[in-house]
Amino acid sequence: MQGIKNLTQGPINRQLFNLAMPIMATSFIQMAYSLTDMAWVGRLGSEAVAAIGSVGILTWMSGSISLLNKVGSEVSVGQSIGAQSQEDARSFASHNITIALIISICWGTLLFIFAEPIIRIYELEDHITANAIQYLRIISTGLPFIFLSAAFTGIYNAAGRSKVPFFISGTGLILNIILDPLFIFGFGLGTNGAAYATWIAEASVFLIFVYQLRCRDALLGGFPFFTRLKKKYTRRIFKLGLPVATLNTLFAFVNMFLCRTASEQGGHIGLMTFTTGGQIEAITWNTSQGFSTALSAFIAQNYAAGRVERVLRAWYTTLWMTGIFGTFCTLLFVFFGNEVFAIFVPEQAAYE
């Protein structure tokens, strides 16, 4: 198949590592959008960080929902590639993109319309609530870019070409880093400036993906982005992606109410500390998800090709790789927690 990297042959350790590193880096880049916003907005004060932190949980929830088509793409397209069925691979790719667009429009519309009652869950001061509502409404209009880019990323991961999403997402992050101080301080837009910078960066990532697929790669021999949904493919995608998306969404939902408790007990400082700490802690589970995603793409191709022994060896390899990194992060957070937190929010009241 055109543009595909065969994962059913060759050294397992090297293939997993080469596949996982760009995926992990891409996950860190997605996390870095929020951390970059917090690092710059932190210079405006803890109240501004609390405003975008309250929206950060909803951004996390949106990313969790987008996993339906990211995971759906990785497994459905990957299995089709392993089974040497290019027609199914192309159909699954088109269906995942179409479903991602539909869900993103519906979810983004809900967040935009109900922004005020959602943000008031946190019971913040009125001026912080107003900033958060404006920030959420700006971000919600860019959700189709995020969901479609997630589907594109899943398709590339399934094809064994995880470096492409990494470089594209990295370009978006660099643009966000450049635009954040310009919009926040240069144009004097404050928290709204961070939202506009992120919106432009995410839109740019989407456009680069479109250019890459249409003009450079012709992945899977080329496939239509949008298609009329068929029950066979749609049901399979939901069966594969919905459990992961539901679990992550419930996790984000629980954290939303933990944020309310933090706000009730500690005001905007409590909320800001909780949300920022969660973003930093996400380093660990973003890493584990990176390896998990690489393992999913690897298993999808090898399972469909009947290479069960490679599936088992890949699973054991992933366990010890993630175990080593998890131990390192635990030591870092336990012994250097204050220093890590102060990088993003320099106010001592937030981390002491």
Task: Identify the function of each model-found stretch.
Residues M1-N18, T198, V210-F251:
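Interhelical loop/hinge segments that connect adjacent transmembrane helices in multipass membrane
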Residues R14-E74, G78, L242-A262:
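Signature of the first transmembrane helix
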Residues L19, I23-M24, W60, A100, ...:
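Residue-level signature of transmembrane alpha-helical cores of multipass secondary-active transporters
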Residues A20, S27, G53-G56, A100, ...:
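Residue-level recognition of transmembrane alpha-helices
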Residues F28, A32-A50, I119-D126, L182-L189, ...:
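Helix-terminus/linker motif at the lipid-water interface of multi-pass membrane proteins
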Residues C106-R137, F328-E352:
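Short membrane-interface helical motifs at transmembrane helix boundaries
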Residues L173-L207, G337-E339:
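Membrane-interface helix-loop junctions in multi-pass transport and translocation proteins
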